[in-house]
Amino acid sequence: MQKKKAYMVATSHIDTVWRWTIADTVEKFIPDTLSKNFDLIEKYPKYRFNFEGAYRYELIKEYYPKAFEQIKKYVRLQNWYPAGSEYENGDVNIPSPESISRNIMLGNNYFYDNFGIKSKDIFLPDCFGFGAQLPQIISDAGLIGFTTQKLSWGSAYGIPFDIGMWVAPNGKEIGASFNAKSYRYKLDGDVRGDLSVIDGIAKCASETNMKLPW
């Protein structure tokens, strides 16, 4: 029997459209995020980190060029993943499909120009509301995944599933994680032998016709 594995990948979200200033982002949040995750990568060679938003990378390149070169090294070593595909984590309710598509194009073009790779997902931890056509827009952009934690804050219809296939009205579909837990969620203890994680993923996948790699 093939051994089943689930991987945990760390992430950090710096909200550059929230109510603090760009100066706060540049002077406080970016260097703190970089230093902590650089230390973790050096201490744990198998540590993996997702960081989204091409705009944040632009700020790093402008204000912390040495750190930007270090990120390039970590990307080559597959410790660091430019994620989210978009240039900025914008609202996806009011903007037109073309606007969302251009946001993806700008973001992934930046990733390709600077790191030689493109992201395959949309990561929107802090946006409220996701239209039914979003899977079609994401799929047509050549992406395969979507993640949010915002539904844990509240939803008129609840959380449809934790992990599974999200299908647009026209039948286009993407893999989606709708319940990535809130920012304050803590996972305690050693979960390496916790089969409930695998079983939970398998159950959700079965209910939404999601193909798993086992």
Where are the regions that the model predicts?
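Catalytic-domain carbohydrate-binding cleft regions of carbohydrate-active enzymes
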Residues: 1-214
